[in-house]
Amino acid sequence: MEQKRKIVPPVYLLMTLAAMTGFNHLLPIAQFTFDPYTTYAGIALIAVGVSIAVVAAGAFWRAGTPVIPFEKSTALVTGGLFRYTRNPMYLGMIVLLLGAGLTFGSVGSLLPVPLFAWIIVRNFIRGEENFLQEIFGDEYLKYKNKVRRWL
């Protein structure tokens, strides 16, 4: 049941970052106080988000299973970050986006973030969950019942 997606999650991430930049300039509503601490917090969240996504992708590579959604999974990864969330790569992307929003410094820049999360759930996570259940059966169901989708 391999499905080919024309747009992969990192492309949605880049599109969301572009939308955030546009919203920041077009809808500069509720500007945050521009102090270095807000910027530092945003940069820290970006670094944490990238780290989460990279560590999670590394777990896939070490297990010999593809990172690209809907390619045939060869291993069910349940260790490391996957003990806490079933979707650490997507969670890392959301943390990165929240950090970017803090760095931009306006509520307007954060408006696309929930849309990104909704698109990821709708276009990827739901299908991936069904796909993994077909491949791994009860093993995946036990994992799914034990570990939350996000945190």
Please report, for each region that a protein language model flagged, where it lies by residue:
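Membrane-anchoring alpha-helices and their flanking helix-loop junctions
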Residues: 1-79, 91-151
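Solvent-exposed interhelical
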Residues: 82
